[in-house]
Amino acid sequence: MDLEKTRDNLKNNVFGRFFLYVLSKGYELGTIVNKFLYENGWRKSYSVNTRVVCVGNITAGGTGKTTAVLLAARTLAEAGIRTAIISRGYKRDKKNKNPVVLFDDELENNWVTAGDEPFMMSRALADVKVPIVIHEDRHLAATEALKRFKSQVLLLDDGFQHFRLKRDANIVLIDARNPFGGGQLLPYGTLREGLSGLKRANLVLLTHSNQADQRKKEDIKDQIRLQNEDIEILEAVHQPEHYFDICNSVKVPLNHLKGEAGVFSAIGEPGGFEDTLKDLGLKLVKVWRYPDHRRYTEEDLKTFVDLAGENPLVTTFKDFVKFPENWRDILKKNVYVLSVSMKIKGKKEFDIFAEALYPKFTNLNVKKESKSRK
């Protein structure tokens, strides 16, 4: 069931709105109680003997969290800092009591056992060899990562509301297009907790900042600073890099596709993805949207091909990894994945981001540069 559509339908009448409001207040109470239990020792938080940096958000879906984790992991790994990602692996098949590890020869673990987002990240980071350890118990996953890989930094993927594993820094993403989830907690809005949770943040990334005007961005920053007066707020954008022609396994430039196209996705914020394609010059004549993390079937792919006709089809990397194994028997040509990366606006601002990941990062780079000059 598409929860977003269900919520919108319920909001169309007074009884539906009241029902969502009651559920939202119940959810809010649950978040308050959970936080209270951890803060007062009724539930235990655990530390590990290395730096832990959380990359998360206060709203559900669509902020660009996965691309931020990829940027953080690549930034650290390319600087020679041993890094691992800790993830829950949302909606994966939980067949293993032990953590699932994605690394090098263990990449044959498929997305069903690992989760679509961790599996996609493992593919994207294969060249810099960043392991990803997946388990619902993030402390158990962190312990496994430290034991196996001697990680200097653990990136806690989407763990801002997860208190079982202590962390050294919280990087929180806020979407400039819809920053505070309508001001209501789930399921009435998309907030995962009240805005007071921003007091725990050490750094905020205002994502999709190029899709909001300056006045709106300043208003968002003012609201953030009402909760956390001295926090650094950086602006980030999602930048298209290229298309990947999956049928021929080649990268093609962004100007390769123009005119009519079909698009399908099962992601948190499909509207942003579709707007990006329009900005790149595509006219979207067929659009398929599915709930986040949905598995694709052979029938889905056949439908896309039949209805798209001679027009190209475009999707995301996250969707691509969820194709059925025999997808090549169905998709013969004109199917593309849009590659997108996150960029921090400004060199000084990027250095602030890097220092939040690893406090000695700038000094480390200075030493590397001085050595290279010799």
UniProtKB/Swiss-Prot annotation:
One of its GO terms (cellular component) is plasma membrane. GO terms for biological process: lipid A biosynthetic process; lipopolysaccharide core region biosynthetic process. ATP binds at T59, A60, G61, G62, T63, G64, K65, T66. Pfam families: LpxK. Transmembrane segments: none annotated. Its EC number is 2.7.1.130. GO terms for molecular function: ATP binding; tetraacyldisaccharide 4'-kinase activity. PANTHER family: TETRAACYLDISACCHARIDE 4'-KINASE, TETRAACYLDISACCHARIDE 4'-KINASE, MITOCHONDRIAL-RELATED. Transfers the gamma-phosphate of ATP to the 4'-position of a tetraacyldisaccharide 1-phosphate intermediate (termed DS-1-P) to form tetraacyldisaccharide 1,4'-bis-phosphate (lipid IVA). This is Tetraacyldisaccharide 4'-kinase. The gene is lpxK.
